[in-house]
Amino acid sequence: MSKIRRKVTVENTKTISESTSRRPSVFERLGPSTGSTTETQCRNWLKTGSCLYGNTCRFIHGPSPRGKGYSSNYRRSPERPTGDLRERMKNKRQDVDSESQKRNTEEPSSPVRKESSRGRHRDKEDIKIVKERTPESEEENVEWETNRDDSDNGDINYDYVHELSLEMKRQKIQRELMKLEQENMDKREEIIIQKEVSPEVVRSKLSPSPSLRKSSKSPKRKSSPKASSAGKKERKAAVVASPLLDQQRNSKGNQSKKKGPRTPSPPPPILEDIILGKKYKEKYKVKDRIEEKPRDGKDRGRDFEKQREKRDKPRSSSPGQHHSPLSSRHHSSSSQSGSSIQRHSPSPRRKRTPSPSYQRTLTPSLRRSASPYPTHCLSSPQRKQSPPRHRSPMREKGRHDHERTSQSHDRRHERREETRGKRDREKDTREERESEHDHRDDREPRDSRDRRDTRDRRELRDSRDMRDSREMRDYSRDAKESRDPRDSRSARDVHDYRDREARDAHARDVRDARDARDARDARDIRDVRDVRDVRDVRDVRDVRDVRDVRDVRDARDVRDVRDARDVRDVRDVRDGHRKEDVYQEEARSYGRNHLREESSRVELRNDSRNESRSEIRNDRMGRSRGRGPELPEKGSRGTRGSQMDSHSSGSNYHDSWETRSSYPERDRYPERDTRDPARDSSFERRHGERDRRDNRERDQRPSSPIRHQGRSEELERDERREERRIDRVDERRDDRVRDRDRDREREREREREREREREKERERELERERAREREREREKERERERERERDQRDRDHDREREREREREREKEREREREERERERERERERERERERERERERERERERERAREREKERERQREWEDKDKGRDDRREKREDIHVREDRIPRDSHEERKSKKRYRNEGSPSPRQSPKRRREHSPDSDTYHSGDDKNEKHRLLSQVVRPQESRSLSPSHLTEDRQGRWKEEDRKSERKESSRRYEEQELKEKLSCGDRQREQAESVDSSRVRAQDLLSHRQAEDRDRDGSDRAHDEKKKAKAPKKPVKKKKEEDVGVERGNLETHEDSQVFSPKKGQKKKNIEKKRKRSKGDSDVSDEEAAPQNKKKRGPRTPPLAIKEELADISTDKDGVLEDPLKKENTAFSDWSDEDVPDRTEGLEAEHTAATATPGSTPSPLSSLLPPPPPVAAASTAATALASSAVSATTSATSSSSAATSNTNGSEDSHRKCHRARGEKVEVSHVTLEDTPHRKLVDQKRSSSLGSNRSHRSHTSGRLRSPSNDSAHRSGDDQGSRKRVLHSGSRDREKTKSLEITGERKSRIDQLKRGEPSRSTSSDRQDSRSHSSRRSSPESDRQVHSRSGSFDSRDRLQERDRYEHDRERERDRRDPRQREWDREAEKEWPRTRDRDRLRERDRDRDRRRDLDRERERLISDPMERDRERERTFETSQLESGKRSEVKLESEHERDLEGSSRDSVALDKERMDRDLGSVQGFEDVSKAERTESLEGDDESKLDDAHSLGSGAGEGYEPISDDELDEILAGDAEKREDQQEEEKMPDPLDVIDVDWSGLMPKHPKEPREPGAALLKFTPGAVLLRVGISKKLAGSELFTKVKETCQQLVEKPKDADSLFEHELGALNMAALLRKEERASLLSDLGPCCKALCFRRDSAIRKQLVKNEKGTVKQAYTNTPMVDNELLRLSLRLFKKKATCHAPGQEKTEDGKLGPCSIQQELCVS
């Protein structure tokens, strides 16, 4: 409490309270000597904005000073005009000590009652708020005492804790003062009498203060010292406690309501309070009950106060305000009811413990125990002295209040009597009298209470005046203590004020009614009484603290000893403050005795304080106890109590403690307990009395009826208001007396404070010593701990190192094992490669036959396409695309690229741009014939290839991939669907051709059919990969797809351009979209009617539509996912049909079925046959599949990669999963259905159709999948599945996750390469030729190519996948492989992009197993080999897409190198072997088709050639349409691809689990040696010629002969003969070089502006300017061309400056320096120039 606040006497308070310019502080509002309250904002004002007291209100009605200055500001803010709260409180203490001795004699019961009721409230609140004030928290008081030392020293906690404690004390005092005012109004006459009784009052106040403190500390004291009044107090506790409890609960509720945040009472006291609250809650509940018995003893005083307050409530509402103003004070002060109570009680507790100043005051406060501060002070000393005493402020009220109250109170009364003699005896007498009197007063008419209140107020004023004078004397002490008690108080007031501002807004709204009514009366009463009470309470408390000190000194009670210790600690902590607090405590005890009518009032106040503390404890704990009247505070304190409990740290103090005194007291408590516990206790008591009065007043208005006198509080409030008004006048009179008394009391208080502070200093020293000892112990312990940890760490490190070494050894062993495995794998792979070579030879023969059939099929397809073109006006563009396709697949590929770029650029939605582009672009018409090329086959292959070429070409793939691939995905999906329809038509046409092919393949095709029946995947694999018998034509469409895939990896651009221009024209052509969809629907209807059920066709359409709908990016992702997943999913479909089956089961049933359905639909569609399929396919699938595809594309792009990869059959999240599962299921069903459904002819036909679809759709899909990367669209999936499913189903069956990935890349590669081979051969590919022709015409006819695509891709992929699944089911070996590989494939599908090489290795290992299975069945083997190579091709394509994304050249080189590897067989890396095997498989498939077995060598060569062609088409086809591939080329390509694929299949069959390490990733890299890089420019600088050139040639050094040679050479090389002459102008080579450089620099000025020369940077601009300004000769201008080593100008200036300095220093040196400087600068200039 800074002296400024202390300066405020009761008169100042009156003046201040009368002046509306400032808001009356808590002290002003609370009591006469509320100079401190001057800056305490009126809670009524804060709450309601209006105060009934008006100018007389002791509290500030302006902006809350506390809100402003919560901490140190608040110290002064509460009593701004008067001075620090501490000073005011000291003055008040002194005044109250003198006055309260007088008054307490005269009006001990009313002020004491107010104090004690406040003290009870505070104690209750302290106890309640400091719910956890357990012995631990009491022990915390020691820490708080230490903190008190800090607080005395103005520690960090000072502002918060000290001000909290100050605020809490102030508010308690204010409540008490309000009670006292109310009582003083009754008791002003009695106050005078009590002033006579002042020694007794001091003693009784001291005793009641100890009772309050001790009672608050221990209900025992309350009981025992007030045993006489114990019955009264118990009655009163019963009476008052129930109202108090009600008020406490009300105040708790109100405070909880009003102050969500309590004013942060010192958190450390909260710990004590929490500890107390924990132990004390139970104890306190018991003790509160007991206390309420002692409180009934105390509450007799308190209940006298309360009854008087009840009586006075009409008059002064002071008794209620004892409780209610306690609550109100706590509310208003702390949280304006509970907050101040809490601040007072819990905060004091906490602050007593935490705030040394508080503990200085704590002893007084504890004795006052109305103020939690003393409780804390005592608590920490009590902890030292007797933990119960610490508790007793809060807990001891619960615990020891009975014991201590009786014992300590009696002993304190005795000691105070001994100490103070008359006053103590009078105070004991008064306390007893006042407890009786309070009971009486409660029973007494308000007049007697008013007299007592008046006396209390007068005594309070006098004691406060004395205290104020003391406080002014204590100013210096208060300078210390001002931080602690005053600052605690001011912090309390600030906190209370802030909380009050928060609460005051609420609490004043609530209490403004009360405060307006009661506060003015109660403030008059309170201000008189509260100032007296605060001062008297403070003085009484200080006197009590002194007496407690004396009682402690008497050591009758260990608690008294502890109190003394606390007092001593408080005094030690606050030696100066202790004296002040002693004075203040004496004044307070005196004033309290006066205020409490010594015994009764002090007992009542101590009881009320102790009970308030216990109530505060209870309130703080839970406010469940002893405070009926403090229900608002209980609410606030309930919040505060809980928040205090939570606020052990004090975080919620402010929140919970809305009353400033509670929060600041709490905040101050830690510091007061730490610093000025005694003074803080005194302050707490003073403030607590005021705060209690305030809270009682306010609470008594709303709360006191609620709490204790809630029934009569309304009347009593009004009466109290009137009485307060009277009492204010009386208080003003009393203030003068009180000022004198206060001066006396302050002197006594200061003496006591000095004593207390000495005690506290001693205690603190002991504490510090103990703390140092503990710290040393802790340090030693920490050192030991650190040592242990270091040892442990070292041991752990050693163990870790051992483990690391072990792991390294394990890794070495693993690596060796893996090396051995890899060697074995390579051996197995080589055998498989040989096996595949043989297979490829067979395949090539079959491929040649198939190629011939494909030629026929292509012819039919072209006819179909012509029909389709004729049918579709949109397809006229597509017909142009067909022409262009026929002419140049590369052009269509370019078109596809451009259109895919289109899409990327223009069409985020796959449908619109793909449709439009399909419609408008050759791609759309001819399925990716960007130039509207009429050759839809070429366009399809081109479109497909551009996908791969884009995949191959990183820029195209990356840039255009999403857009173009999306477009192409849509286009290829639509084109695929249209191709599927076309393929269906073609397959209808080709069904004969396919059947013929398959009959031609019948050797293999019989196997294939048997295997197709077993598993259509095998049939498709045979058709497509395994035997490529039906596939051979398809594989010239489809195996070309696979070689196309491979070559698309290699020649992705070209072959994809060619084959996938067909396929992708179908698949991607956006323009075809609608007509494609319709035509595909019609075709699917027709074909679905013929071959596939409408359901199949419809799901196909749905699936196609699904992808069409999905965004391009999604579609492309899905397409790539499809590619990966098609390959993978075809493996899974073979294994699990987990491939992305977006289509319904019937869509998927068989690709063959779907293809046949497509054929039928395509055939019907060309004829515009609206079969049920078209009706079924187009409408439902577009919706389902469109949404599904859109969702699936989006989700399958994400989840299809994951879900489909993880479980292809598991519904790729949303549609993708459903597509996958549908496709799988549909494939399985469809395959089963088609196996059963499709005849052997149909099976071949389906194979052809599937192969066509697979080739067109598969390559489209592969391309799309490739192109789209992971964009998976059902169309792409079905495209992949249709094309890839045949080969990739084999792969799916035969390859695991790696096969999946290979299926993705191989299907892509296989389908695309087979298509590319077909395109290269000139066949559009079976599916490409027939399906593409059909698809082109169909897709052009199909209004929605997406639906066609979906139909094609879905039906194709589903059919082939279902067949594959059927085959898998039939072939348990393949099922096993599928099971092995499918999960892996799914895993690898997820990881395929990342780990496809690994997947390939694993697929190879799996494929080795599969090869064994295939070797069991040569057809199976062939199909597997083909599928594996195709998968590998697809994987290669993926690899190549990855690598092609890096560079198309790489993929070309890779494909070439793969072919070379296959040819060489030496450089068969796992990946290379996979690719080679894929190529060889494709080659063998194609070679099977290509009847010419002699072409095996050709196909190996042709693989290289076709790969070269593919690479060329990739390179050129990326930008150009792919050139049509002749059948011979295709056969060679297919043969080479098949051989390489066989080799790769062998390797893939070998794939026993290979690690990424095992994978020879070099296969991804082009085999051709890197071009020798020219040495870097940096190295060129150091060639001899360059060095000499830089140096320049000097005639002298080089010699005339050499120089002549050089000159001649230079002249020859120089362009302008003129320049040659000037080359060697100078003798020195360096000068020549410099001149030459200048010329070059000048010449390059405006020409060589660097890479980023859109704008001239300043550097370049300035350089140019410098160069242009320069002379050729290198004059000074030239110095700026190159940054001069020396800035000549700067040098000159610096030299001049140096010279000047040197001249100044040594004028003689100037000349030499000038002389030196001149030459230096000149020389340097010359050098620089």
From Swiss-Prot:
InterPro entries: m6A_RNA_Methylation_Regulator (IPR052824), Znf_CCCH (IPR000571), Znf_CCCH_sf (IPR036855). There is a cross-link at K179 (Glycyl lysine isopeptide (Lys-Gly) (interchain with G-Cter in SUMO2)). Keywords: Coiled coil, Developmental protein, Isopeptide bond, Metal-binding, mRNA processing, mRNA splicing, Nucleus, Phosphoprotein, Repeat, Ubl conjugation, Zinc, Zinc-finger. Residues 204-213, 321-345, 1160-1176, 1184-1218 have a biased composition (Low complexity). A zinc finger (C3H1-type) spans 36-64. Associated component of the WMM complex, a complex that mediates N6-methyladenosine (m6A) methylation of RNAs, a modification that plays a role in the efficiency of mRNA splicing and RNA processing. Acts as a key regulator of m6A methylation by promoting m6A methylation of mRNAs at the 3'-UTR. Controls embryonic stem cells (ESCs) pluripotency via its role in m6A methylation. In the WMM complex, anchors component of the MACOM subcomplex in the nucleus. Also required for bridging WTAP to the RNA-binding component RBM15 (RBM15 or RBM15B). Component of the WMM complex, a N6-methyltransferase complex composed of a catalytic subcomplex, named MAC, and of an associated subcomplex, named MACOM. The MAC subcomplex is composed of METTL3 and METTL14. The MACOM subcomplex is composed of WTAP, ZC3H13, CBLL1/HAKAI, VIRMA, and, in some cases of RBM15 (RBM15 or RBM15B). Also a component of a MACOM-like complex, named WTAP complex, composed of WTAP, ZC3H13, CBLL1/HAKAI, VIRMA, RBM15, BCLAF1 and THRAP3. This is Zinc finger CCCH domain-containing protein 13. It comes from Mus musculus. The lineage of its organism: Eukaryota, Metazoa, Chordata, Craniata, Vertebrata. The gene is Zc3h13.
